[in-house]
Amino acid sequence: MGTVIGLDVRDGRLPDEAFEAAIGWLTDVDLRFSPFRPGSEISRLARGEVASEDCSPDVRFVLTRCEALRGETDGFFDIRGPGLRGGLDPSGYVKGWAVEEAAHILEAAGARNYVLNAGGDVVLRGAPEEGRPWIVGIRHPLESDQVAARLAFEPGPGRMAVATSGLYERAGHIVNPRNNEVPAELLSMTVVGPSLALADAYATAAFAMGREGLPWLASRPGYAGYAIDRELRPSWNADLESYLAAAASSTGPARQD
């Protein structure tokens, strides 16, 4: 996926086979889905060399989910278009989905307290140690070595996810369908929720929506957003307040989104 993978597991040593399986899965996804690889299924599909019904089950699943998300977001999440590499690029969903599936592999091997970070797409569960939350830092959109805000995640029954879309990521491929232009109102949009696949896609859509992104996210049960506009002014949903407040009272280091 052209990104760096970071993993912190606090459950003791997991079997080497679990790590190998997770990395193997992510490598396989990159080989099949990357629009930058001429021989990938996605590239061949974009060129019309294969039909969607002849693609692998995973590719067909992703195409179906992306089409559903296009409808859910009123076209603000769209994997097809002239501004996308080859006219077809599902990366805005695939990355989060692939990392989430890798987390399933680790959990099947016994991981219950971990953070998995793939180039800023973060999925986490449990806690680093008893009485402390995981801390995730939202990257400053203009200063890559700075953190714009910190979010704290207390231990819960399931996993949580953080995904960001912004100018430093792939905004040149994010287009407002109303005017076919790159969004001009925001520098970044971060989404928090239980599914990394959806958080990734929602961040892309909400970034494209500009100032309407946060109100739209408020209508997505379980999801909340943190936006930074062109004047570096932050704004966020009410549901995100608890994560910000918890981080303000914690002294732990932040893992950058």
Task: Locate predicted features.
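Mature catalytic core of soluble alpha/beta enzymes
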Residues: 1-257
